[in-house]
Amino acid sequence: MRKSLLLSGLAFWITLIAAHAGIVEKTYQFTDFKIQQEQGYQLIQIDGLLLTGLVGEPALPYQDVKLVLPPGERAVSIEFIGSDEMLLSGSYSVYPQQPSRPLSEPGNGIFQKNESVYQANSFYPAQSTGQLQTAYLNGYAIAISSFTPIKYNPSTGQVSLYQNVKIRVVTEPASKSTFALQNISSSERIKSRVSRFVQNEAMMKTYPSKAKSGNDYDMLIITAAQFENEFQDVIDLYLQRGISVQITTKETINSQGTGQDLAEKIRNYIIDQYQDNGIEYVLLGGDVEHVPYRGFYCYVQSGGGYEDSDIPADLYYSALDGTWNDDNDNRWGEIGEDDLLPEIAVARFSFSNLTELNSMIHKTTSYQDNPVLGEFNETTFAGEWLYSNPLTYGSDYLELLIGYQNENGYETWGIPETYNFHKLYESTGSWSAADLRAQINAGRQYVHHVGHANSTYVAYMSNGDIQYRNFFLVLTVWILNYTFFQSWMWCLMIVTASWKKW
């Protein structure tokens, strides 16, 4: 009954503001650019824009578009209106976009260049905007797209830049957008997060507000019944920080919830708790034998193509719009079924038994309550060689984690520049597993690695390298000081920590 009344109220609100719906506009400005030489070609780079393109075609800088739409509306078309066109001096041969390739493929690959595009005496791209879609974040309908302010004639080498671009999005009423309004949150923290994500936060004021419920709480823990009483230290930890916690079991959800399987019942329960009680965090207590995962489908267009229909993804439990399987087949998360804007934060304690759970709880509480202060500003970066064509290293991406950055279309504030950075970069020299172990043994708060991996291999280390004897200095500190190894290792690569394959 409560949700029926909510939907009725939202529909009435939308009727009142319908006269203001229909068109959303924003103007973007571009003044600075730089030209980078790459293997006899040129790359045109603009701060804050992502350099990309279709494989074999010119790689150009693209601006992201993230515009809040009127409540209950979806985006139906996008228009690019460029002005103050500036002709760049000289003639250019813009670098063709190359495909990503797994390390397992032999050789350096074939250099991709679409000759028909490069021989055409016409401006590229024919359409300046990318695909347009309507996404939803915490109840707000958002037009997602991109555009390039660059015009390029491959035949003549002429390049021009629009210094001002107006983007116009036309909207229309949509039932899916009305339904998404159920996910409007009363949390100021969530509203602030949405406002930082979008580019026209003033439009958010046209959305209905939601009052806090008397039953609101912050964090939900879902675990197996046998572990329900083992999370008190975690609950106390968060209560001390002003985060209220409730716990339930998968058995309760399975017996009382709705859905075709346990994973869907858990997701539906999370949706109810988010909409009715305002939760912002979910902790899944247990590995997949205790709390199931949802396997997603993906086809990667690289080389001969790679396909997987069972990629474990807890994003299913945090991105709460839609069903992730609109056509009810055996492929979850196909194109058009996905929801890549999560409403809440979801984490998982991947334990199988009580011993592992107690260890994870001990590490979690000790890390927050008793940090090793002398190591807090010590960080190790480990970057491998990634690809030859174009030449790419992990260090290219690791450097973007330091301080303020606005590369690739994202604005980030990373690890403070005042920290001590210990860098193992193959861009400047070789390094080995022994070098990385020495860094860990020296005491590092964060270890960030970008390279190649598999389910049993990472950072030049295999399963056999994870032995006590290889981390003797850490263990010596633990024995003498009754503390423990306090270090996070974060890795960006393919199938690392692929626990489903073990």
Task: Annotate each PLM feature.
Residues 20-502:
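Cysteine-dependent hydrolase recognition
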Residues 8-17:
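Bacterial N-terminal signal peptides
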Residues 1-4:
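Positively charged n-region of N-terminal signal peptides that target proteins for export
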